[in-house]
Amino acid sequence: MEFSPPLQRATLIQRYKRFLADVITPDGRELTLHCPNTGAMTGCATRGDTVWYSTSDNTKRKYPHTWELTQSQSGAFICVNTLWANRLTKEAILNESISELSGYSSLKSEVKYGAERSRIDFMLQADSRPDCYIEVKSVTLAENEQGYFPDAVTERGQKHLRELMNVAAEGLRAVIFFAVLHSAITRFSPARHIDEKYAQLLSEAQQRGVEILAYKAEISAESMALKKSLPVTL
């Protein structure tokens, strides 16, 4: 996926009120960007980081500029717009870049399912195979090349794991897919030190037949694409 029109560069001053960030452009203008990320954004929003932002042509938007990427002071690219996790995953499935999810003839998004009234991110179907339910999570928390999810306690994420376990129990295919959107990450684990319950449920889900996949995106200021499978340690 290529960014079109091209992203613009600025330097981060601060992120605040979760959804806003102040930046300064190379020519000295100060802008307020929309921040499309409700998470803690640990390591993704340090003062002085380079920010890459898009600009909407919707004149009715109060904040027409959207923070898309961080380029950390160590040089790592991080996609902070959580909407891209699903977009990149869908693109990779359709391109058959994810070997474990290839060979299906139909892809549906936001399908209602489960006892807890959830919506699955993607459902894959083929005549000769069980339906495949895929829940996507965006991974941006990194420590010494180790990627972690979640970056804060997530009851919603815990619910999704319970739903996937029920799917697997019905004889269908259930997949939790971690889209790693941080260029410095080389391996993935659940963030037991942040949400122990989630880590426990992820291990239980694997034991009950839920598949765990982690794929890393190649990220630059020009483009992004999920390319590489990463090792997962529970």
Swiss-Prot record:
Short name of one Pfam family: SfsA
GO MF term set: DNA binding
Residues within the DNA-binding region(s): 201-220
UniProt KW keywords: DNA-binding
Domain of life: Bacteria
Gene3D superfamilies xrefs: 2.40.50.580, 3.40.1350.60
Family that this chain belongs to: Belongs to the SfsA family.
Job description of the protein: Binds to DNA non-specifically. Could be a regulatory factor involved in maltose metabolism.
Name of the protein: Sugar fermentation stimulation protein A
Gene: sfsA
